[in-house]
Amino acid sequence: MSALANAMQRFISGGADGDPNEGERLKRNMRINTIHGVFQIAAINMVQPFLSIFALKLKASNAQVALLSSGPAIVSLFAMIPGAILVDRQDKKKRLTMLFMLAHRAFFLALACIPFFAPSWRAWALVALVALMNLPGSMSNTAWQSFISRIVPPDKRAVAFADRNKFMNLFGTIVVLIAGRILDWLAFPIGYQVMFVAAFLMALIELRIFNMIDEDAAPAQPPVPRGEPAEGRAAPLMDRVGQRLAEVRDQPKFVRYVLASMLFYLAWQIPWPLFSLYQVKVLHANNTWVSILNLMNTGGSLIGYGFWVGIMQKHGNLKTLFYSTIWIFIVPLVYAFSHSLWTVAIFNMLTGAIFSGVNLALFNALLEATPDTNKTSYIAYYNTAVTISAIIAPMIGVGLLDFMNYQWAFLVCAALRIIGALCFLLINKLEEREAGRGGAAKTCAQSA
């Protein structure tokens, strides 16, 4: 065990001896960030991919399956902005981010206790716990995004996050394969209980690694002041809300990106519960098949990351976002005409390559669109806005089945995804036009 720890420490340090300079500290932090991502996805992938099948084994209804997506989104609406304000007030953000992460991972132990509930309450207990789990989960996600944006400078992000995502997908898929096989091998519900407890233990290792990131290597950033009360009294709530809305309106680039993202996320997430229902109820997928689908998806993503990094470095974040999102209509289109899990698995290679670009560009475009001042709060505003889409989308998806069959529902979802992708093309054109006007005005001023 000590040999493994020494080997990991050697990898993190990059083989360098003595006191590291600024460049070496950055490289070390980037390596730790990648390793943290591996253990993070290992813990999460022992739980998240199998929740829908777990719910159906607990006799959950279609509406309850949809609530596995909508419930966490509803909870996060009330968590992200207060959490972001709290994080923004911290000079050092790592400790608070870790506490949010630990609180989120502790819910894995609560999930393991669901079989002890009365059978009629188990499905609702799962829905409630998954929703409540997102209270610290959404806070930790917002805090991590703000924290890591300070650790990794803009010119290093494309490569750094591509490497992180590549290793996360690779090791995450290995974990899903092993977990799926174990779940199908062990009797229900023992397998799920074992997996949820193992996920929590893995999360403890994850947090230990995250704590190794050197926050002092990041540029100094003073905490956001709490604000001085006017005449000894705090400003009324509506006045504070109005002030924040005015601040957001003064960031047109951010507002455009938020509106486009809301429409995109709505179109992206509508078919999510339909995929799970179709896989299990129509194509009769088990946990092993969920693992196989993840494996094929990862195979495509490992190829895709290198391609999309090159596109991003050449064309920028927004164009890359459009170039990648325009193809995600293929996923519901394949489901509309697929009657075999093997067909879905084969096309998952292609969709994995596509979504590696989507995930990479979404995150980098967000960091680019948010102002440096109060960055955590702006990230929370963004996440809150797209969460509204996440609340509505699964219900719309399940609702489509009340009016049409799976095939037509998937075709409608494919059309909506094309419309969602076009939103990013629109804001890219608007920004190019504004940049052109700014350049022309500058030329006129110089010639005057």
PLM feature segments, named:
Residues 192, 207-226, 425-438:
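Helix-loop junctions on the cytosolic side of multi-pass membrane transporters
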Residues 49-57, 85, 112-118, 172-196, ...:
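Transmembrane alpha-helix termini and helix-breaking/packing motifs in multi-pass membrane transporters
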Residues 62-63, 154-164, 287-288, 370-382:
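Loop-to-transmembrane helix entry/capping segments in MFS-fold secondary transporters
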Residues 78-95, 183-184, 303-317, 401:
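Helix-to-loop junctions at the C-terminal end of transmembrane segments
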Residues 2-27, 217-259, 441-448:
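Juxtamembrane intracellular "pre-TM" segments in multi-pass secondary transporters
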Residues 2-78, 87, 94, 98-104, ...:
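Helix-loop boundary and gating motifs at the non-cytosolic
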Residues 95-111, 197, 319-334, 411-414:
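Structural signature of the two symmetry-related core transmembrane helices
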Residues 137-152, 357-371:
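Intracellular juxtamembrane helix-capping segments at the cytosolic ends
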